[in-house]
Amino acid sequence: MRISLNWLRELVEIKLSPEELAHILTMAGFEVEDIEDRRTWANGVVVGRVLERQPHPNADKLSVCQVDVGATETLNIVCGAPNVRADIYVPVATVGAYLPNIDLKIKPAKLRGVPSQGMICSLKELGLPSEVDGIYIFPQENLPLGSDVRPLLGLDDVILDVTATANRADALSMVGIAREVAALTDAKLSIPKPGEAFVSESVGKLGLKIADTQACPAYIGTVIEQVKIASSPEWLQQRLRSAGVRPISNVVDITNYVLLEWGQPLHAFDQERLKSVANADNLTIGVRCANQGETLKTLDGQTRNLTTQNLLITANDQPVALAGVMGGEETEVHEGTQSLILEAALFDSVAIRRSSRSVGLRSEASGRYERGVNRAELEIANRRALSLISELADGVIVHQEIADTRPDPTTWSRSIFLRLDRVNEVLGPINVGETGELEAKDVERTLTALGCELTPAGEGTWNVSVPPYRYRDLEREIDLIEEVARLYGYDNFCDTLPDKAEAGYLPVDQELVRKLRAALRAEGLTELIHYSLVKPGEDRQIVLSNPLFVEYSALRTDLLAGLIDAFQYNLEQGNGSLNGFEIGRIFWQEEDGLQEKDAIAGIIGGDTSLGKWSKGSKDQPLTWFEAKGILESVFQQLGILVEYQPDCRDERLHPGRTASLWIGGNRLGIFGQLHPQLRRDKDLPESVYVFQLDLDVLLDALDKDEILVPAFKPYSTYPASDRDIAFFAPVKISVSEIEKAINKAGKGLLESVELFDEYRGENVPQGQRSLAFRLVYRASDRTLTDTEVEPVHNKVREALVEKFGVNLRS
């Protein structure tokens, strides 16, 4: 937004230079992108009066003028403008003047043989826009000759190009910037009074019909008659030009002026043209969404094809304007306008943004509506415009209609609880006082300057009432703290070193998962990642209601299916057996609702050894025990003891070669060989083994002090005493159960138990097998004697006979 310092000085007392003011605004978050110092544009240009004009003797298009600039002698100036004539007041660039906009230094010269002692200037030569070819002629009479033209042309001004952040819609107006400058510099604020607009008594002049009160919560329509359309006074035109707005006519310029001053968009309709569009004398102004297929020719001359996303202003249901964006060409104010309807309205920011984007049209009005217009200043801006129209266009206000569904004005402000301790905690040390902390009076002074009202709520606490024009961006305590920091100045904060940082660390679960991944990779397994979405078809699957693809429309219930398919695909591609694992989430549904948990699964198969020369170039598939050994090695690296029990619940696994895994009495998962039928269906080798574990159960088992922080246990320096024990045991009794019983019976001296032989066949009773274990006894403080070992070993033998009914062979 372009800010005129001359205009700003009327609203707030400014004693700073333009550069100092620009620095303060930039430090407060309003970046000043450019400082346009117009005072240099017409330095040395004075008011002159053309006394006489004669044609140039040697050129048809040139004139020789005698110009009085208040000096002792008149100047002889050659001019090529077609509109130069005698007895007019003009800007004259005297000898020595420099015009930076055309890069010209005025020197005495001869033009076609006639001496010229200056130049009569046009507005373009002075850097100002102009729609008239030729020199500029002052409309005023009896101007002091030789006086500086800059105050007359608005060239005694400095323009700041200020960018407001997206959350500061209130700063898109001169009043908003004035409030900000007053708060930053502790200067006196002089907000312009809107004036009183007298509405004469009349009935039936205008009706309102708001179809969507959410999109248009407030609408004021005012009928004004006896309007005289003319050019705006010079002061108004100068202010519009300084803001980059082209003056058009007094009424249109007033609506643009109020937009710049208060940030409230307004629009003026020609009343007679509205009646023509509506084809009726009684008008009803409406606000509704467009119907598909409707069109509207806007003020830029473009015909817009409308959709239901566009919000319209209508006259008796006929489109006349894009609400909050741009008016229609059919109803614009023109030179012959004598009566008009002034629109002042509040439109929803989302509705305007959607409407603006759908037609690819942005305007000053839509930009402000999209950011949010202050609902408390609608009437002020409307009265200001009506007062100026009455003053500058002789308009008579004959009727006014208001449709207002805004909430009660008491809700236009909010109260926020603010704590002084929290302010200093967030901001840290500041260059203020001896303590380096803000005091209560500092906070009160800063927020009061912003227009907030503070009510003490205790020692160092306040209830802060936010003004309506800051309602949209001051919502929480942290917003108020930011305002305190911004107004106090970010450059006033102390330079402090950050506190000593602690070394970063991962949560225990993540550390354990990383340790688990490392253990699996150490065993030669590759980590795989599959989609969580799979084909539907299982009973317990959770199916998506709106999938992108039918093939990926259900959540996976386990990880094994994806691993088996990946193993098959790699074989088909000639890549050999894929030994891998995956950590991921699985999902299923039960009667009590949807369930999910993390799991880890793996697949092992084929010949894992390198080189076949020692095996006669033949594959040597993994046995069940070798595959189990890989998993056991992982558990050993993790420092946990897992028990195996026979299991045959999973139909995809071999019923006689499947075990469930248990840890601490909790089911950990399953391990087994693929079922022969599944192996044949997928054309897989015979020795393919899979496992799937409950990751939560595994992490709970690992999350123990003795595992997370291993304790040193000294090795015994004394020799061990070995004992072997062999017996016939029922096949239904697992080795793990037997080992558990042996460890319990030999507790104290027993160091380890190892199965070293299993035999089934001749000389073994039906339904039994021969098992042989090696038991190692050792003490940490002495060499064990036979008299110490034998009682313990006999206790083990007795426990096996008593618990399992084994037939001892040794």
From Swiss-Prot:
<keyword id="KW-0067">ATP-binding</keyword>
<keyword id="KW-0820">tRNA-binding</keyword>
<keyword id="KW-0963">Cytoplasm</keyword>
<keyword id="KW-0436">Ligase</keyword>
<keyword id="KW-0460">Magnesium</keyword>
<dbReference type="InterPro" id="IPR005147">
    <property type="entry name" value="tRNA_synthase_B5-dom"/>
</dbReference>
<dbReference type="InterPro" id="IPR045060">
    <property type="entry name" value="Phe-tRNA-ligase_IIc_bsu"/>
</dbReference>
<feature type="binding site">
    <location>
        <position position="483"/>
    </location>
    <ligand>
        <name>Mg(2+)</name>
    </ligand>
</feature>
<dbReference type="InterPro" id="IPR041616">
    <property type="entry name" value="PheRS_beta_core"/>
</dbReference>
<dbReference type="InterPro" id="IPR009061">
    <property type="entry name" value="DNA-bd_dom_put_sf"/>
</dbReference>
<comment type="subunit">
    <text>Tetramer of two alpha and two beta subunits.</text>
</comment>
<dbReference type="InterPro" id="IPR020825">
    <property type="entry name" value="Phe-tRNA_synthase-like_B3/B4"/>
</dbReference>
<dbReference type="Pfam" id="PF17759">
    <property type="entry name" value="tRNA_synthFbeta"/>
</dbReference>
<dbReference type="GO" id="GO:0009328">
    <property type="term" value="C:phenylalanine-tRNA ligase complex"/>
</dbReference>
<dbReference type="InterPro" id="IPR036690">
    <property type="entry name" value="Fdx_antiC-bd_sf"/>
</dbReference>
<dbReference type="InterPro" id="IPR005121">
    <property type="entry name" value="Fdx_antiC-bd"/>
</dbReference>
<keyword id="KW-0479">Metal-binding</keyword>
<comment type="similarity">
    <text>Belongs to the phenylalanyl-tRNA synthetase beta subunit family. Type 1 subfamily.</text>
</comment>
<dbReference type="InterPro" id="IPR033714">
    <property type="entry name" value="tRNA_bind_bactPheRS"/>
</dbReference>
<feature type="domain" description="B5">
    <location>
        <begin position="411"/>
        <end position="495"/>
    </location>
</feature>
<feature type="binding site">
    <location>
        <position position="479"/>
    </location>
    <ligand>
        <name>Mg(2+)</name>
    </ligand>
</feature>
<dbReference type="InterPro" id="IPR012340">
    <property type="entry name" value="NA-bd_OB-fold"/>
</dbReference>
<dbReference type="GO" id="GO:0006432">
    <property type="term" value="P:phenylalanyl-tRNA aminoacylation"/>
</dbReference>
<feature type="binding site">
    <location>
        <position position="473"/>
    </location>
    <ligand>
        <name>Mg(2+)</name>
    </ligand>
</feature>
<keyword id="KW-0547">Nucleotide-binding</keyword>
<dbReference type="Pfam" id="PF03147">
    <property type="entry name" value="FDX-ACB"/>
</dbReference>
<feature type="domain" description="tRNA-binding">
    <location>
        <begin position="39"/>
        <end position="150"/>
    </location>
</feature>
<feature type="domain" description="FDX-ACB">
    <location>
        <begin position="716"/>
        <end position="809"/>
    </location>
</feature>
<dbReference type="Pfam" id="PF03483">
    <property type="entry name" value="B3_4"/>
</dbReference>
<dbReference type="Pfam" id="PF03484">
    <property type="entry name" value="B5"/>
</dbReference>
<dbReference type="GO" id="GO:0004826">
    <property type="term" value="F:phenylalanine-tRNA ligase activity"/>
</dbReference>
<dbReference type="Pfam" id="PF01588">
    <property type="entry name" value="tRNA_bind"/>
</dbReference>
<dbReference type="GO" id="GO:0000287">
    <property type="term" value="F:magnesium ion binding"/>
</dbReference>
<dbReference type="InterPro" id="IPR002547">
    <property type="entry name" value="tRNA-bd_dom"/>
</dbReference>
<dbReference type="InterPro" id="IPR045864">
    <property type="entry name" value="aa-tRNA-synth_II/BPL/LPL"/>
</dbReference>
<dbReference type="InterPro" id="IPR005146">
    <property type="entry name" value="B3/B4_tRNA-bd"/>
</dbReference>
<dbReference type="InterPro" id="IPR004532">
    <property type="entry name" value="Phe-tRNA-ligase_IIc_bsu_bact"/>
</dbReference>
<protein>
    <recommendedName>
        <fullName>Phenylalanine--tRNA ligase beta subunit</fullName>
        <ecNumber>6.1.1.20</ecNumber>
    </recommendedName>
</protein>
<keyword id="KW-0030">Aminoacyl-tRNA synthetase</keyword>
<dbReference type="GO" id="GO:0000049">
    <property type="term" value="F:tRNA binding"/>
</dbReference>
<keyword id="KW-0648">Protein biosynthesis</keyword>
<keyword id="KW-0694">RNA-binding</keyword>
